C-alpha cells in the first residue's frame, strides 16, 4: 500500500484554475555531516548522477532536468519549530544540494505539539542542533548542517534559497531586501494556530520552464487551410486539449511541408477540434496527415520584494468561499507582528484584553495601508479569532503550509511549476467547536506538556477526547506515514482506552524512501506497518499503536469483524487502489463509522470526508472509466508509444506468464481441458495452442534453444507479421471510398532486418531468451558477446506472406470473427497434447512482472519490445524511464503533496472527533501545487430516497432479527411475510452478495423447497460456502413492489443471525 493515487476527481467550488521567533542569542555552532556520507553514497550536484532507484517516483513529477537543478541548490531553513522541521524534511527528501538549519531558540513544551524531531528530553536544548542528526538521516545524499549564529549578510550569501519561518517582520524585511538585491530566492512561511501565511520572492527575472508539469499534448491533423490565419482541424477521435497562447510544432504533414520542423508557433483555439496558426496563404496545398505537438516555451516572470509586496500584495486564493479573507488576514498578520514586538509574546489564548488590543492594532495598520489593500470594513471578528488562536501550534496546519512552502522551494531551485504569486493565506476556522461558548481562557491555558500548542487552540477537553480515540489506519505507505506522524503529534490514541491499528502487508523498497519518511535505508525489506509504528513511538512515546500485516477484504473479515469495527471511532484510508477504497467505504457505511479518504497523483491531491447520516459515501460518485486502447490498434495499427508499450506488456504476459500457468494447470488439473473448452469465443483455441507450443513445439532443452527461440520470435514480430500486414494492406491501398487506407491514425509500418550489431536487437534477444529460459527452469546468461556470436549461426526460415490470412481492421470485426470456433482444430489440438502422465515432475515457472528490479530482464524486454515495434511504425521511441512509467503504471509521487494533503485530512479529523453536525463545517478539498490551485467544497449530502412516506439514505437499513423468540431461525416464507405485514412491501427478488436466494420467476418446485428452509441454510447452499463463526449478520439486497404493484427502491437488510 505504497503511493496513493487520487481516489477520485472531486467537485470543487470556484472558477477554473489559472496557470516562535528566534529571539534568544546563542553562540554560533556549526555541526556538519561528513561531505561523503558514511554509506558510501556520493553527494548531490554535478559530481553524481541522479539515483533513479531512490528518486524514481519524484522524477516522474519533476523530470531529470529540474532534478539536476535541484541538486545544485543550497537551502537555508531558519526556524526549527513544527513548520520549519516540516519544510526541512520535505526538501531534504526532495534531494537539494545541501540544507542548513538555523535557530537560536531552545525547545519548549509547546514545540512538541508539532515538532516531530524534538523529544521530551530535548526541552531547553537548541532546536536546530537537536533536529540536525534526525533530519540528516532522511537522505544520505543531502548534507545537513546546524547553525545557531545571527543571520548576517556574509552567511546568507552562500545560499540559493532562504526560508524564514516564525520570524519577526522586522527580520523578514531585512533579510528579504538583502535576498532580493542579491538574487537569492526567498520563501517566508508562518503558522499561527488555525491560520497560515506564505510569501515568495524569486527575483525580478525568473525563468519558468514549465508552468503546469503536464505532459505535452499532441493530436493528429486532418486538415490545414491556406489562409491568414491558417486553420488546423484535428481528427475527431479526441479533443485536442490545447489552450489559446500555447505553442505548437508540426511533423509528418504531407503537402504543406512548410509546417514541418518550423519554429514553435502560438495558436488561438477556435473549438475542441480546431485552432488557428500563422499565415499559411503562401504555403503548399495540404494533402494529408501530420502530428501537432505542444511545445513548452520558457518564459520570464518577475517578483516584487517583500517590502514592496507588503504594501501592494497579490494573493493566491485558497478557498473561493472566503474570497475576501486574504486581504483581511494580510492586515491581521501585520498587526500580530506588532503585538509580538511590543509584548515579546503572541496574544494569550482566548484572552479578551489581548484580542481587543490586536483589533485596535489591525485598525491602525488598515488606516495606514495603501488604497489597494485598505479594507473598507475590517473583519473584527476574524481578527479576534486570530488573536484567540495565535499562540497555538498545530501539526496539521504546519503539514499543509509546510508542504506548500517546500514545493515553492523546489520551484525556486528548478524553475519547474508556477510559483505562488506572491502571498497565500489559509485558515481552518471550521475546526473550532460549533458551539462558540465552549472554549474559555482557563481551558486553553498552558500546562507544560507536549500538547500545549494544541490546547491553546482547542482547549483541554478535546485533547482528552483525542487521546481516547480508536482509529483504524489502512496502509502505511506515503500517506500512511504522514498520517501516523500527525496522529502522534495531535495525541490521537495516546490516552487511556485509545489505540491506532495500522495494517499494511507490504515490505519497504528503496523507491519508498524518497517520500515515506518514517523509513530509512536500513529498513529496506522490513514490514512497513511494524517499522512505521516503531518510528512514531519515537516521536510520541505515549502513542498506542498496533501494527498488522493483513490485506483488507472479504478474506480478513474474521479478523476485522463486527467486534473490531464496533469498537472503532473511525477509519483513515491510505490506500493505493480504488477497489480497496470502495471495500473500506462499504465497511464504514455498514458499521456507520466516519471515513477519512485521500489520495495524491504527482502535485495533485484530494481529500474527502465521509460522515454517517450526513454526507454521501466515497462510492456514491465515481470517475468515468479510463479510456482503453482498441485491440486492433494494439495488434495492427499503433500510432503512439503508449500503444507499443501496452503491446509489449501483453507480450510479456502472453510469453512468460500465461502459458506457464496454463501448462501447470493442464498437468495437475484433470478438468483443465474441459473447463477451457467452455471459455468464450476463440479463447479455448488460444489457450490450448499455447499449451501445445510450450510442451511440444517450442520446449527448449538448453540455453542455446532459448536464444534460437528468441531470434525466431524477433523475426516473427518485427519482420514476418509486418510483411503479412503489408501484403494484406499495401502502402498504396485505398478504402472503398477512395481514401488512402494508411492515413489518419493508421501509420504505414515497415519490416525490420535483424542486425546482431544493433544494440536494441541484441537487447531484445538477451531479455527474451533469459526470460524464456527462466520459465523452464533453465540457466540463462548475461554474456552478450557469446550470444552475438551464436546468433550468426542461427538459421531463420524464409518467410513468404500468405494469401487468405484475415487481419481485422476494427474491434467489431474481431468480435464477429471470435464468435465462431473451428471445432475440428480443437479436436486436433486435444489429440496432440502429451498426456500429463508422460511428464512426471515437470512444471513451468510463470513470471510476474516486476518493474523496479533492474537485474531481472523484465524492463529490458519491455523497452526493447516496445521500441522495436515503435521503429516498425516510425513512432518516436521512449527511454527506459518513460517506458517504466507507462508500462509499470507507476503513480508519480512527491513528499510535498503528501504532506499538504494529510494536513488537510487531519483538519477534518479535528471536526470528526468533536462531532460536528453541520455539513458546511466539513471541507472536501482538491489541490494542484504545480499551478498552484486550491479548491474546497462542502461534502455532498447523502442522497435521499423514499418509499411510501418513509425517507431513507445509504446510511439507513432494515434491521431483521433472524432468530425468533423460540430460538428457531426465520424461514424464507416467514421473511417474505414479515416484509408484507410490517412494511407493506412484496419482495420480488432477494439476494446475498452474488447469490440469488429468491425471485418471483423461480421454478415452482425450487420455490416450494426453499420457502420452508432457514435463511442461513439457503445462503450456504446457494453460495456453496459455509458461514464462518465470525459472521453475526448477513447483508441482503431486496427488489420490492408496493401495494399498488409499482417497483420501489428500498434500503438493504441487516439480517442478524447471532
UniProtKB/Swiss-Prot annotation:
The keyword RNA-binding does not apply. ISGylated. It is found in: Cytoplasm; Mitochondrion; Nucleus. Changing residue 67 to A: Localizes to the nucleus. Localizes to the cytoplasm. It comes from the Eukaryota. The modification N-acetylserine is found at residue 2. GO terms for molecular function: ATP binding; RNA binding; ubiquitin activating enzyme activity. Sequence repeats lie at residues 63-199, 459-611. Changing residue 4 to A: Reduces phosphorylation. Residues 1-47 are annotated as: Disordered. Pfam families: E1_4HB, E1_FCCH, E1_UFD, ThiF, UBA_E1_SCCH. There are two active sites within the E1 molecule, allowing it to accommodate two ubiquitin moieties at a time, with a new ubiquitin forming an adenylate intermediate as the previous one is transferred to the thiol site. Monomer. Interacts with GAN (via BTB domain). Catalyzes the first step in ubiquitin conjugation to mark cellular proteins for degradation through the ubiquitin-proteasome system. Activates ubiquitin by first adenylating its C-terminal glycine residue with ATP, and thereafter linking this residue to the side chain of a cysteine residue in E1, yielding a ubiquitin-E1 thioester and free AMP. Essential for the formation of radiation-induced foci, timely DNA repair and for response to replication stress. Promotes the recruitment of TP53BP1 and BRCA1 at DNA damage sites. This is Ubiquitin-like modifier-activating enzyme 1. It comes from Homo sapiens (Human).
Amino acid at each position: 500500500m505504497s503511493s496513493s493515487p487520487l481516489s477520485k476527481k472531486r467537485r470543487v467550488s470556484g472558477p477554473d484554475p489559472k496557470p516562535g521567533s528566534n529571539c534568544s542569542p546563542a553562540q554560533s555552532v556549526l555541526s556538519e555531516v561528513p561531505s561523503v556520507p558514511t554509506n558510501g553514497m556520493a553527494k548531490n550536484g554535478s559530481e553524481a548522477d541522479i539515483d533513479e532507484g531512490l528518486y524514481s517516483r519524484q522524477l516522474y513529477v519533476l523530470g531529470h532536468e529540474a532534478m539536476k537543478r535541484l541538486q545544485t541548490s543550497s537551502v537555508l531553513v531558519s526556524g526549527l519549530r513544527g513548520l520549519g522541521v516540516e519544510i526541512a524534511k520535505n526538501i531534504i527528501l526532495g534531494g537539494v544540494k545541501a540544507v542548513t538549519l538555523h535557530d537560536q531558540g531552545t525547545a519548549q513544551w509547546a514545540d512538541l505539539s508539532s515538532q516531530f524531531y524534538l523529544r521530551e528530553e530535548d526541552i531547553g536544548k537548541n532546536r536546530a542542533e537537536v533536529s540536525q542528526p534526525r533530519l540528516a538521516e532522511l537522505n544520505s545524499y543531502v548534507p545537513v548542517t546546524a547553525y545557531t549564529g545571527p543571520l548576517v549578510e556574509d552567511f546568507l550569501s552562500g545560499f540559493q534559497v532562504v526560508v524564514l519561518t516564525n520570524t519577526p517582520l522586522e527580520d523578514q524585511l531585512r533579510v528579504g531586501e538583502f535576498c532580493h538585491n542579491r538574487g537569492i530566492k526567498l520563501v517566508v512561511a508562518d503558522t499561527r494556530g488555525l491560520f497560515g501565511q506564505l510569501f515568495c520572492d524569486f527575483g525580478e527575472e525568473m525563468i519558468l520552464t514549465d508552468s503546469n508539469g503536464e505532459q505535452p499534448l499532441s493530436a493528429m491533423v486532418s486538415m490545414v487551410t491556406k489562409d491568414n490565419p491558417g486553420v488546423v482541424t484535428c481528427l475527431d477521435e479526441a479533443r485536442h486539449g490545447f489552450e489559446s497562447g500555447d505553442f505548437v510544432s508540426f511533423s509528418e504533414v504531407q503537402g504543406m511541408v512548410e509546417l514541418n520542423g518550423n519554429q514553435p508557433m502560438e495558436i488561438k483555439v477556435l473549438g475542441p477540434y480546431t485552432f488557428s496558426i500563422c499565415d499559411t496563404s503562401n504555403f503548399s496545398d495540404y494533402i494529408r496527415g501530420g502530428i501537432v505537438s505542444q511545445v513548452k516555451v520558457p518564459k520570464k516572470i518577475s517578483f516584487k520584494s517583500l517590502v514592496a509586496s507588503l504594501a501592494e500584495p497579490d494573493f493566491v486564493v485558497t478557498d473561493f468561499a472566503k474570497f475576501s479573507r486574504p486581504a483581511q488576514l494580510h492586515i491581521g498578520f501585520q498587526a500580530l507582528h506588532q503585538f509580538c514586538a511590543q509584548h515579546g509574546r503572541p496574544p494569550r489564548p482566548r484572552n479578551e484584553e489581548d484580542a481587543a488590543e490586536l483589533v485596535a492594532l489591525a485598525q491602525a495598520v488598515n488606516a495606514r495601508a495603501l488604497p489597494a489593500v485598505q479594507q473598507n470594513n475590517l473583519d473584527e471578528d476574524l481578527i479576534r479569532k486570530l488573536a484567540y488562536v495565535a499562540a497555538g501550534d498545530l501539526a496539521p496546519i504546519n503539514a499543509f503550509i509546510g508542504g506548500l512552502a517546500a514545493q515553492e522551494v523546489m520551484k525556486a531551485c528548478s524553475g519547474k511549476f508556477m510559483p505562488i504569486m506572491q502571498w497565500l493565506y489559509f485558515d481552518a476556522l471550521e475546526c473550532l467547536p460549533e458551539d462558540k461558548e465552549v472554549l474559555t481562557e482557563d481551558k486553553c491555558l498552558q500546562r507544560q506538556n507536549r500538547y500545549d500548542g494544541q490546547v491553546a487552540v482547542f482547549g483541554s477537553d478535546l485533547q482528552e477526547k483525542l487521546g481516547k480515540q480508536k482509529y483504524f489506519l489502512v496502509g502505511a505507505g506515503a500517506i500512511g506515514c504522514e498520517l501516523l506522524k500527525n496522529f502522534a503529534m495531535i495525541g490521537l490514541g495516546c490516552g487511556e482506552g485509545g489505540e491506532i491499528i495500522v495494517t499494511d502487508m507490504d515490505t519497504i523498497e528503496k523507491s519508498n524512501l524518497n517520500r515515506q519518511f518514517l523509513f530509512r535505508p536500513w529498513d529496506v525489506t522490513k514490514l512497513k506497518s511494524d517499522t512505521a509504528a516503531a518510528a512514531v513511538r519515537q516521536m510520541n512515546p505515549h502513542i498506542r499503536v498496533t501494527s498488522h500485516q493483513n490485506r483488507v477484504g472479504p478474506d480478513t473479515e474474521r479478523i476485522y469483524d463486527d467486534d473490531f469495527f464496533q469498537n472503532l471511532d473511525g477509519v483513515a484510508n491510505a490506500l493505493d487502489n480504488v477497489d480497496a477504497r470502495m471495500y473500506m467505504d462499504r465497511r464504514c457505511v455498514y458499521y456507520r463509522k466516519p471515513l477519512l479518504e485521500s489520495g495524491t497523483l504527482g502535485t495533485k491531491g484530494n481529500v474527502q470526508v465521509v460522515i454517517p447520516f450526513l454526507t454521501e459515501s466515497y462510492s456514491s460518485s465515481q470517475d468515468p472509466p479510463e479510456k482503453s486502447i482498441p485491440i486492433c490498434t494494439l495488434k495492427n495499427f499503433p500510432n503512439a508509444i503508449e500503444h507499443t508499450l501496452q503491446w509489449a506488456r501483453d507480450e510479456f504476459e502472453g510469453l512468460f506468464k500465461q502459458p506457464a500457468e496454463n501448462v501447470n494447470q493442464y498437468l495437475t488439473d484433470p478438468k483443465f481441458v474441459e473447463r477451457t473448452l467452455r471459455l468464450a469465443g476463440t479463447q479455448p483455441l488460444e489457450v490450448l495452442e499455447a499449451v501445445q507450443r510450450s510442451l511440444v513445439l517450442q520446449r527448449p532443452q538448453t540455453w542455446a534453444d532459448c536464444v534460437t527461440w528468441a531470434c525466431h520470435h524477433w523475426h516473427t514480430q518485427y519482420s514476418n507479421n509486418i510483411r503479412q500486414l503489408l501484403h494484406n494492406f499495401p502502402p498504396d491501398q485505398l478504402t472503398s471510398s477512395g481514401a488512402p487506407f494508411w492515413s489518419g491514425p493508421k501509420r504505414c509500418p515497415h519490416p525490420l532486418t535483424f542486425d546482431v550489431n544493433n544494440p536494441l536487437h541484441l537487447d531484445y534477444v538477451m531479455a527474451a531468451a533469459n526470460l524464456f529460459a527462466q520459465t523452464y527452469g533453465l540457466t540463462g546468461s548475461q554474456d552478450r558477446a557469446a550470444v552475438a556470436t551464436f546468433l550468426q549461426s542461427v538459421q531463420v526460415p524464409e518467410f513468404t506472406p500468405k494469401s487468405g490470412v484475415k487481419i481485422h481492421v476494427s474491434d467489431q470485426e474481431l468480435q464477429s470473427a471470435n464468435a465462431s470456433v473451428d471445432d475440428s482444430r480443437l479436436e486436433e489440438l486435444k489429440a496432440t497434447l502429451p498426456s500429463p502422465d508422460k511428464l512426471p515432475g515437470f512444471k513451468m515457472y510463470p513470471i510476474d512482472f516486476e518493474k523496479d528490479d533492474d537485474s531481472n530482464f523484465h524492463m529490458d524486454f519491455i523497452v526493447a519490445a516496445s521500441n522495436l515495434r515503435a521503429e516498425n511504425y516510425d513512432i518516436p521511441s521512449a527511454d527506459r524511464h518513460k517506458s517504466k512509467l507507462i508500462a509499470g503504471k507507476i503513480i508519480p509521487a512527491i513528499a510535498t503533496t503528501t504532506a499538504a494533503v494529510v494536513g488537510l485530512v487531519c483538519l477534518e479529523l479535528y471536526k470528526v472527533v468533536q462531532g460536528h453536525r453541520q455539513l458546511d463545517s466539513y471541507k472536501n478539498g482538491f489541490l494542484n501545487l504545480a499551478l498552484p490551485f486550491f479548491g474546497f467544497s462542502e461534502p455532498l449530502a447523502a442522497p435521499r430516497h423514499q418509499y411510501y412516506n418513509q425517507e431513507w439514505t445509504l446510511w439507513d437499513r432494515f434491521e431483521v432479527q433472524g432468530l425468533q423468540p423460540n430460538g428457531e431461525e426465520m424461514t424464507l416464507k416467514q421473511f417474505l411475510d414479515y416484509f408484507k405485514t410490517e412494511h407493506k412491501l412484496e419482495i420480488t427478488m432477494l439476494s446475498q452478495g452474488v447469490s440469488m436466494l429468491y425471485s418471483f420467476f423461480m421454478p415452482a418446485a425450487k420455490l416450494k423447497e426453499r420457502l420452508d428452509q432457514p435463511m442461513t441454510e439457503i445462503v450456504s447452499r446457494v453460495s456453496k460456502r459455509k458461514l464462518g463463526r465470525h459472521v453475526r449478520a448477513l447483508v441482503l439486497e431486496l427488489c420490492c413492489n408496493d401495494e399498488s404493484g409499482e417497483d420501489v427502491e428500498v434500503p438493504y437488510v441487516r439480517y442478524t443471525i447471532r
